[in-house]
Amino acid sequence: MKIAITGKGGVGKTFIASTLMRLFEKNGFKVIGVDCDPNPTLALAFGVEEEIVPLSKRHDIIEERTGAKPGTYGNIFKINPKVDDLIDKVGYKIGNITLLVMGTIEEGGEGCVCPASVLLRRLLRHLILKRDEVVILDMEAGIEHFGRKTIDTVDLMLIVIEPTKKSLITAKRMKKLANDLGIKNLGVIVNKVRNEDKELLKDIIKEELGLEVLGFVPYDEEVIKSEFLGKPINLDSKAAKEIEKIFNYIIKLKNTT
Protein backbone atom coordinates (compact mmCIF):
# COMPACT_ATOMS: atom_id res chain seq x y z
CA MET A 1 0.00 0.00 0.00
CA LYS A 2 1.45 3.34 -1.07
CA ILE A 3 -0.15 6.45 0.45
CA ALA A 4 0.55 10.13 -0.22
CA ILE A 5 -0.57 12.59 2.46
CA THR A 6 -0.95 16.15 1.22
CA GLY A 7 -2.43 19.47 2.26
CA LYS A 8 -1.58 23.04 3.18
CA GLY A 9 1.29 23.61 5.56
CA GLY A 10 0.29 23.52 9.21
CA VAL A 11 -2.87 21.43 8.87
CA GLY A 12 -1.37 18.41 10.65
CA LYS A 13 -0.11 16.20 7.81
CA THR A 14 2.91 15.01 9.75
CA PHE A 15 0.88 14.17 12.86
CA ILE A 16 -1.59 12.13 10.82
CA ALA A 17 1.16 10.50 8.72
CA SER A 18 3.18 9.45 11.77
CA THR A 19 0.11 8.12 13.57
CA LEU A 20 -0.88 6.03 10.56
CA MET A 21 2.66 4.66 10.38
CA ARG A 22 2.51 3.59 14.02
CA LEU A 23 -0.91 1.98 13.53
CA PHE A 24 0.35 -0.01 10.55
CA GLU A 25 3.37 -1.15 12.58
CA LYS A 26 1.16 -2.03 15.55
CA ASN A 27 -0.84 -4.30 13.25
CA GLY A 28 2.19 -6.20 11.99
CA PHE A 29 3.19 -4.25 8.88
CA LYS A 30 6.65 -3.05 7.93
CA VAL A 31 6.52 0.63 7.09
CA ILE A 32 8.66 3.13 5.21
CA GLY A 33 7.86 6.71 6.17
CA VAL A 34 9.13 9.30 3.72
CA ASP A 35 9.52 12.94 4.74
CA CYS A 36 9.22 14.88 1.48
CA ASP A 37 8.83 18.31 3.08
CA PRO A 38 11.61 20.91 2.63
CA ASN A 39 11.24 21.54 6.37
CA PRO A 40 11.42 17.93 7.62
CA THR A 41 9.78 17.24 10.99
CA LEU A 42 8.56 13.65 10.62
CA ALA A 43 11.28 12.25 12.88
CA LEU A 44 10.26 14.65 15.65
CA ALA A 45 6.79 13.09 15.64
CA PHE A 46 8.49 9.86 16.76
CA GLY A 47 10.48 11.59 19.49
CA VAL A 48 13.74 11.51 17.52
CA GLU A 49 15.75 14.54 18.60
CA GLU A 50 18.99 13.80 16.81
CA GLU A 51 19.40 15.40 13.42
CA ILE A 52 18.88 13.13 10.43
CA VAL A 53 20.83 14.43 7.45
CA PRO A 54 18.47 14.58 4.43
CA LEU A 55 19.45 12.52 1.41
CA SER A 56 19.66 15.72 -0.65
CA LYS A 57 22.55 16.80 1.61
CA ARG A 58 24.41 13.47 1.42
CA HIS A 59 26.81 14.69 -1.23
CA ASP A 60 28.93 11.57 -0.91
CA ILE A 61 26.02 9.28 -1.80
CA ILE A 62 24.78 11.54 -4.60
CA GLU A 63 28.20 11.55 -6.22
CA GLU A 64 28.70 7.81 -5.67
CA ARG A 65 25.37 6.92 -7.30
CA THR A 66 25.20 9.47 -10.12
CA GLY A 67 28.88 9.99 -10.87
CA ALA A 68 28.59 13.76 -10.46
CA LYS A 69 28.84 16.20 -7.60
CA PRO A 70 25.63 17.87 -6.38
CA GLY A 71 24.96 21.28 -7.85
CA THR A 72 26.72 20.55 -11.13
CA TYR A 73 24.98 21.11 -14.46
CA GLY A 74 25.92 20.15 -17.97
CA ASN A 75 28.12 17.30 -16.76
CA ILE A 76 27.46 13.73 -17.73
CA PHE A 77 25.87 11.72 -14.93
CA LYS A 78 23.75 8.62 -14.53
CA ILE A 79 20.04 9.21 -15.01
CA ASN A 80 19.17 5.75 -13.64
CA PRO A 81 21.29 5.48 -10.49
CA LYS A 82 21.12 2.42 -8.23
CA VAL A 83 18.69 3.13 -5.38
CA ASP A 84 17.34 -0.22 -4.17
CA ASP A 85 19.75 -0.37 -1.23
CA LEU A 86 19.49 3.26 -0.14
CA ILE A 87 16.68 2.61 2.33
CA ASP A 88 19.00 0.40 4.38
CA LYS A 89 21.90 2.80 3.88
CA VAL A 90 20.28 6.11 4.88
CA GLY A 91 17.01 5.11 6.59
CA TYR A 92 16.48 5.63 10.33
CA LYS A 93 14.99 2.56 12.00
CA ILE A 94 12.35 2.74 14.73
CA GLY A 95 11.12 -0.79 15.29
CA ASN A 96 9.52 -1.90 12.02
CA ILE A 97 9.30 1.68 10.75
CA THR A 98 12.08 3.09 8.59
CA LEU A 99 12.17 6.87 8.24
CA LEU A 100 13.65 8.38 5.11
CA VAL A 101 14.28 12.14 4.99
CA MET A 102 14.49 13.32 1.39
CA GLY A 103 15.29 17.02 1.88
CA THR A 104 15.05 19.79 -0.67
CA ILE A 105 16.83 20.57 -3.92
CA GLU A 106 17.87 24.21 -3.78
CA GLU A 107 19.63 24.54 -7.12
CA GLY A 108 17.90 24.94 -10.43
CA GLY A 109 14.32 25.44 -9.34
CA GLU A 110 11.31 23.41 -10.38
CA GLY A 111 12.00 20.47 -12.62
CA CYS A 112 15.78 20.82 -12.48
CA VAL A 113 17.69 17.93 -14.00
CA CYS A 114 20.67 17.69 -11.67
CA PRO A 115 22.30 14.77 -9.87
CA ALA A 116 20.43 15.31 -6.59
CA SER A 117 17.01 15.63 -8.21
CA VAL A 118 17.57 12.55 -10.39
CA LEU A 119 18.55 10.45 -7.37
CA LEU A 120 15.65 11.62 -5.16
CA ARG A 121 13.03 11.17 -7.86
CA ARG A 122 14.30 7.74 -8.83
CA LEU A 123 14.26 6.67 -5.18
CA LEU A 124 10.68 7.85 -4.76
CA ARG A 125 9.62 5.94 -7.86
CA HIS A 126 11.40 2.85 -6.54
CA LEU A 127 9.60 3.12 -3.19
CA ILE A 128 6.19 3.42 -4.81
CA LEU A 129 6.62 0.80 -7.54
CA LYS A 130 9.02 -1.80 -6.16
CA ARG A 131 8.85 -2.05 -2.38
CA ASP A 132 6.59 -4.50 -0.55
CA GLU A 133 6.38 -2.44 2.64
CA VAL A 134 3.63 0.04 3.38
CA VAL A 135 5.01 3.36 2.13
CA ILE A 136 3.58 6.60 3.51
CA LEU A 137 4.71 9.88 1.93
CA ASP A 138 4.46 12.99 4.09
CA MET A 139 4.28 15.48 1.23
CA GLU A 140 4.73 19.22 1.07
CA ALA A 141 1.76 21.37 0.04
CA GLY A 142 2.86 21.36 -3.60
CA ILE A 143 4.59 18.24 -4.92
CA GLU A 144 6.16 20.02 -7.89
CA HIS A 145 9.37 19.97 -5.83
CA PHE A 146 9.86 16.35 -6.87
CA GLY A 147 7.83 16.43 -10.06
CA ARG A 148 4.26 15.28 -10.54
CA LYS A 149 5.14 11.93 -12.08
CA THR A 150 6.81 10.80 -8.86
CA ILE A 151 3.49 9.98 -7.16
CA ASP A 152 1.12 9.16 -10.01
CA THR A 153 0.99 5.47 -9.06
CA VAL A 154 0.17 5.77 -5.34
CA ASP A 155 -2.76 3.65 -4.17
CA LEU A 156 -4.34 6.43 -2.15
CA MET A 157 -4.00 10.19 -1.75
CA LEU A 158 -5.21 11.68 1.51
CA ILE A 159 -5.84 15.42 1.57
CA VAL A 160 -5.66 16.87 5.07
CA ILE A 161 -7.57 20.07 5.71
CA GLU A 162 -8.55 22.16 8.70
CA PRO A 163 -11.65 24.35 9.05
CA THR A 164 -10.21 27.28 7.06
CA LYS A 165 -10.75 28.65 3.58
CA LYS A 166 -7.02 28.56 2.81
CA SER A 167 -6.75 24.83 3.41
CA LEU A 168 -9.86 24.25 1.29
CA ILE A 169 -8.28 26.15 -1.60
CA THR A 170 -5.16 23.97 -1.35
CA ALA A 171 -7.37 20.87 -1.22
CA LYS A 172 -9.04 21.88 -4.49
CA ARG A 173 -5.62 22.20 -6.10
CA MET A 174 -4.54 18.80 -4.81
CA LYS A 175 -7.77 17.20 -6.03
CA LYS A 176 -7.18 18.58 -9.52
CA LEU A 177 -3.61 17.31 -9.44
CA ALA A 178 -4.80 13.84 -8.39
CA ASN A 179 -7.36 13.81 -11.18
CA ASP A 180 -4.76 14.93 -13.72
CA LEU A 181 -2.45 12.12 -12.61
CA GLY A 182 -5.18 9.50 -12.68
CA ILE A 183 -5.04 8.71 -8.96
CA LYS A 184 -8.29 6.84 -8.39
CA ASN A 185 -8.52 6.66 -4.60
CA LEU A 186 -8.80 10.06 -2.98
CA GLY A 187 -10.14 11.05 0.42
CA VAL A 188 -10.28 13.98 2.83
CA ILE A 189 -9.29 14.09 6.49
CA VAL A 190 -10.50 17.10 8.45
CA ASN A 191 -8.20 17.91 11.37
CA LYS A 192 -8.70 20.11 14.46
CA VAL A 193 -12.48 19.75 14.40
CA ARG A 194 -15.03 20.63 17.06
CA ASN A 195 -17.74 18.00 17.35
CA GLU A 196 -20.53 20.50 16.73
CA ASP A 197 -19.02 21.53 13.38
CA LYS A 198 -18.88 18.08 11.75
CA GLU A 199 -22.15 18.17 9.81
CA LEU A 200 -21.54 21.70 8.55
CA LEU A 201 -18.03 20.81 7.40
CA LYS A 202 -19.23 17.60 5.76
CA ASP A 203 -21.75 19.58 3.70
CA ILE A 204 -19.21 22.24 2.73
CA ILE A 205 -16.61 19.67 1.66
CA LYS A 206 -19.16 17.71 -0.35
CA GLU A 207 -20.23 20.89 -2.14
CA GLU A 208 -16.76 22.37 -2.66
CA LEU A 209 -14.71 19.21 -3.29
CA GLY A 210 -17.15 16.42 -4.03
CA LEU A 211 -15.01 14.06 -1.96
CA GLU A 212 -15.71 11.65 0.87
CA VAL A 213 -14.59 12.67 4.34
CA LEU A 214 -12.76 9.66 5.75
CA GLY A 215 -12.46 11.11 9.22
CA PHE A 216 -12.89 14.12 11.47
CA VAL A 217 -9.89 14.32 13.80
CA PRO A 218 -10.89 16.30 16.88
CA TYR A 219 -9.03 19.20 18.41
CA ASP A 220 -7.08 17.40 21.13
CA GLU A 221 -4.91 19.00 23.79
CA GLU A 222 -2.90 15.77 24.03
CA VAL A 223 -1.72 16.39 20.46
CA ILE A 224 -0.59 19.91 21.33
CA LYS A 225 1.22 18.65 24.42
CA SER A 226 2.96 15.78 22.63
CA GLU A 227 4.11 18.00 19.76
CA PHE A 228 5.38 20.65 22.18
CA LEU A 229 7.35 18.02 24.11
CA GLY A 230 8.52 16.22 20.95
CA LYS A 231 6.93 12.92 21.94
CA PRO A 232 4.71 10.52 19.98
CA ILE A 233 0.98 10.90 20.61
CA ASN A 234 -0.70 8.33 22.84
CA LEU A 235 -2.54 5.93 20.52
CA ASP A 236 -5.41 5.89 23.04
CA SER A 237 -5.98 9.64 22.68
CA LYS A 238 -9.15 11.00 21.09
CA ALA A 239 -7.33 12.15 17.97
CA ALA A 240 -5.47 8.86 17.50
CA LYS A 241 -8.67 6.85 17.91
CA GLU A 242 -10.25 8.80 15.05
CA ILE A 243 -7.18 8.19 12.90
CA GLU A 244 -7.52 4.50 13.71
CA LYS A 245 -10.92 4.56 11.98
CA ILE A 246 -9.19 5.96 8.91
CA PHE A 247 -6.58 3.21 9.22
CA ASN A 248 -9.36 0.60 9.22
CA TYR A 249 -10.77 2.15 6.03
CA ILE A 250 -7.33 1.92 4.41
CA ILE A 251 -7.02 -1.75 5.38
CA LYS A 252 -10.37 -2.49 3.73
CA LEU A 253 -9.23 -0.61 0.63
CA LYS A 254 -5.95 -2.56 0.63
CA ASN A 255 -7.81 -5.86 0.76
CA THR A 256 -9.98 -4.94 -2.23
CA THR A 257 -7.23 -3.68 -4.55
From Swiss-Prot:
Cell inner membrane found in the keyword field: no
Gene3D superfamilies: P-loop containing nucleotide triphosphate hydrolases (3.40.50.300)
Protein origin, superkingdom: Archaea
Family annotation (CDD domains): CooC1
GO cellular component, one term: cytosol
Parts forming coiled coils: none
Family membership noted in the UniProt record: To M.jannaschii MJ0084 and MJ0685.
PANTHER family with a match to the protein in the record: SEPTUM SITE-DETERMINING PROTEIN MIND HOMOLOG, CHLOROPLASTIC, SEPTUM SITE-DETERMINING PROTEIN MIND HOMOLOG, CHLOROPLASTIC-RELATED
Protein name: Uncharacterized ATP-binding protein MJ0823
Species of provenance: Methanocaldococcus jannaschii (strain ATCC 43067 / DSM 2661 / JAL-1 / JCM 10045 / NBRC 100440) (Methanococcus jannaschii)
